[in-house]
Amino acid sequence: NGAQFAFIKLLASKYQNLCVVGDDDQSIYKFRGADISNILQFEKNFNNARVVKLEQNYRSTKTILDAANEVIHNNKGRKDKTLWSDNEQGEKIDLYQAEDAYAEADMVASTIKENVDFGRADYSDYAILYRTNAQSRALEEKLLLRNIPYKIIGGQNFYQRKEIKDVLAYLRIICNATDDIAVERIINVPKRGIGATTVTKAKDFARAYGFNLYESLLEVENIPGLERAATKVRKFTDLIENFKDQQQSMSLKELVNEVLNETGYVAELAAENTDEANGRIENIDELITKVTEYEENTDNPSLAEFLEEVALVSEIDNLDEDSSYVVLMTVHSAKGLEFPNVFLCGMEDGLFPGYMSIMSDDPEELEEERRLCYVAITRAMKHLTISYAK
């Protein structure tokens, strides 16, 4: 940023003994203060600077480099250079148009699955890149459907997100009230005035009488020291008992919606009205979609079986570091990395490039998006697929 460059100029002012390595075409951190003019104006600040262009690329095929060059040459604010390679010409870049984000994600997942099943690639050969973290939801769903192991770099896998774990904890208690971990997780979520002291006393009572935690809560009136908390605890257990009764006459989707409505979980998030809270609501909507799809695709759907399936796919989050898996990440997170096969998803106006960049009066905003696209394209070594939804 400007302050850092001013500091460097002061440090180097006497002896001019300074070496700088950078690529203006990969300057993608304007949003956190990086200033591309530090590179573009470098020779003006250091008159005797010797410039060495490193234009040979050892990573990508000629086809991929040609595409990257075609994109970045549209930028005016850059040092003139053209990447070249002694690598093979390589495969053509695939361009895929989908009806919507889910069809796009389905194409990505099915392509990966087919290539791995036929021995043409390993899961670790693939990276899925996107502009914003929110785009990972549809991709995760389709990868999970095909049992494709994956990791999100710089983000959380779907079933590790707080709101998803909270809702699933309610469902686990309804299915099996002996699940002490689930009970402890949501006894005060959303906040209902049941504190850690109350939980500790209930656990002590449970140990003393051979109960599980939920059974102990049902006996709250008999637990010494919990007289004041008894009403709040009783409201919680009444809520759970009501859900257990309704489970018999409701579909799973109806049950989930009942839990969300009666607990006020979504209402509390909606009241926050922040981007983070709205993102959590969208994740919960995604969970409801998964529940609906499970019911539609299962002959005799049950809460217990659904939770078993969730437990199985959640194991993907605990992958061994040496195992083979697909990586998902934003383009910003991918800078400096390389992968044999790259899917660049969501390449439609308003998403990538972003709406604000398109509408901005500052041409530098769109040039930043173009640099980001250049970074994305040049992550691919062998094959690149660019996709977008109508």
Task: Annotate each language-model stretch with its function.
Residues 1-41, 56-60, 259:
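Conserved helicase NTPase motor core
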Residues 22-25, 32-36, 56-58, 68-69, ...:
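A short beta-strand-to-loop transition that corresponds to the Sensor-1 phosphate-sensing loop
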Residues 4-7, 11, 67-68, 112, ...:
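Structural preference for long, well-ordered alpha-helical segments in enzyme cores
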Residues 25-30, 59-60, 152-175, 187:
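Short alpha-helix plus adjacent loop in nuclease-associated cores
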Residues 27-30, 60-66, 73-74, 80-81, ...:
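Switch/connector loops and helix/strand junctions flanking conserved nucleotide-binding motifs
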Residues 14-17, 23-25, 46-51, 88-93, ...:
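Short glycine-/polar-rich loops that comprise or flank the Walker A/P-loop
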Residues 47-50, 56-149, 172-176, 230, ...:
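Helicase P-loop NTPase motor core
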Residues 136-148, 161, 168-390:
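Conserved helicase C-terminal RecA-like lobe
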